[in-house]
Amino acid sequence: MLDYTLAEVASAVRGELAAGSADARVLSAAIDSRAVDAGALFFALPGERVDGHEFVAQAVTAGASGAVVSTTRPRDSFGDLPEAFGLIMVDDPARALARLAGWHRRLMKASVVGVTGSAGKTTTKDMIAAVLAESFSVLATEGNMNNEIGLPLTLLRLQPGHDVAVLEMAMRAPGEIAALAETARPDVGVVTNVGYAHIGLLGSQSAIADAKAELVRALPAHGFAVLNGEDPRVRAIERFAPGRSLLYGLSPECSVRAVDVALSEDDTSFAVALDGQAVPDVRFTVPVPGRHNVLNGLAALAVGWRLGIEPEAMARGLASFRPSAMRMHFVQAPRGFTVIDDTYNANPASVRCAIDAALQHAAQRRVIAILGDMLELGDAAAAGHAELGEYAVYAGVSGLVTVGPLAALAAESAVQAG
């Protein structure tokens, strides 16, 4: 819960308190009038289909203490408002939301961990939160609250009792992660990989790597970067770290290294060497299949290690991890079928990981992959889908069902591959 005056908020967002009592309290923030409760500050954000300015009256009815609105809207356009209802006029309500979140973050004692990457960032974020929760009070991104609107709303849930905030950072264009980092001011930056996600928007993997590097560049001198040592493009980002950095992976040069990896139908386990020294008497288990989850788990352990958590506590935290909805979610269906729901989002790297995890879980059973179109791949779309068809065959998938014109290229490629 927040507890600021309207005057304090107006100053923080660089706006003008045009109506209402300067001493009125702001207890929360909302962008949806249906989610407003007593004391909330309603941010009237313009959207493609609806404009928040049309719902200020509903926010009043729901008990909001005020609204942040654009200076382009005349005061009388909101109808008859209560005398005590605050109106803060700003140039850009979305930017004002980010400013309030950044100001609030600076008043809290919590450290901030930022997580980005082309694939695996949600799973890695959830694993980091699970590991840290063994020793700290943790706030973590929920659902898809990882953009210029969701991240500020998450930060505004930060309380004095929180020790750490683990924030997922997504992007669709250069500069977006830099803007998120300006708001969140991360102390730790985690980059999982550089793949083909959004290559249709950014143009090349090099451009994607540059965008991901914005998180590392934003770290303070006392912060540290946690980077996937198995991805050459991520390793190259290390040179941008203002402070300390470490690599995680399976290679000997990685500071946090997995050894003795064991894959089973239901989980993935491994031992760990830290700076070349084996962690004795502790084995780490991720309760989901998939070799890629070794790397996700190592990222979480690297953060936990740097924040001083004991190995035994980290092992307990990692074992408690549960995936978010529609991300490698296992559903037991009738007649002995297992449905693996990984439908939230897809790019070539994440689909390969899903296929590998399904085959690992299936053991001797048949695996049928259902593949839809992967979007925002630009010029790489045709090749990306075709390569997945080949990969499915060579990996051992028994059948492939495709939906959509791009996914049909995967089916054609699978037939040609046998």
Tell me the role of every PLM-derived stretch:
Residues 74-82, 188-338, 365, 390-393, ...:
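Acidic, Mg2+-coordinating active-site environments of NTP-dependent enzymes
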Residues 47-50, 324-326, 343-417:
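Active-site beta-alpha connecting loops in nucleotide-dependent enzymes
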